UniProtKB/Swiss-Prot annotation:
This is Colipase. GO terms for cellular component: extracellular region. Forms a 1:1 stoichiometric complex with pancreatic lipase. Its main location: secreted. Residues 18-22 form a propeptide. Expressed by the pancreas. Disulfide bonds join C34-C45, C40-C56, C44-C78, C66-C86, C80-C104. GO terms for biological process: digestion; lipid catabolic process; post-embryonic development; response to bacterium; response to food; retinoid metabolic process. SMART domains: COLIPASE. Colipase is a cofactor of pancreatic lipase. It allows the lipase to anchor itself to the lipid-water interface. Without colipase the enzyme is washed off by bile salts, which have an inhibitory effect on the lipase. Enterostatin has a biological activity as a satiety signal. It comes from Rattus norvegicus (Rat). Belongs to the colipase family. Keywords: Digestion, Disulfide bond, Lipid degradation, Lipid metabolism, Secreted, Signal. Induction: Expression levels increase upon lipid ingestion.
Length: 112
């Protein structure tokens, strides 16, 4: 138990000692390895396969494939950029398997 506490304290100290605005565990740039979308500046941690390495990447642009939400913090398809909505079918099974895909659409443009 002591070893775990010491390891945790050391990990936190290293994270806070990181120079500049970019940390070791947060504010990661596109292309850097991540384990959760909250670590990325873009707020999208994506992998291609279940065993693939997840990396930070930009959010989906208009007319690109997207995922509306994730239960796990890692996407197969990133959510849409600000101002766009991910339009597509949603199901409980798709939410669990992280396969609820849609297409990013500009909701203001589609109403006109």
């Amino acid at each position: 138990m002591k070893v775990l506490v010491v390891l945790l304290v050391t990990l936190v100290a290293v994270a806070y000692a990181a120079p500049g605005p970019r940390g070791l565990f947060i504010n990661l740039e596109d292309g850097e390895i991540c384990v959760n979308s909250m670590q990325c500046k873009s707020r999208c941690c994506q992998h291609d396969t279940i065993l693939g390495i997840a990396r930070c990447t930009h959010k989906a642009m208009e007319n690109s494939e997207c995922s509306p939400k994730t239960l796990y913090g890692i996407y197969y398809r990133c959510p849409c950029e600000r101002g766009l909505t991910c339009e597509g079918d949603r199901s409980i099974i798709g939410a669990i398997t992280n396969t609820n895909y849609g297409v990013c659409l500009d909701s203001t443009r589609s109403k006109q």
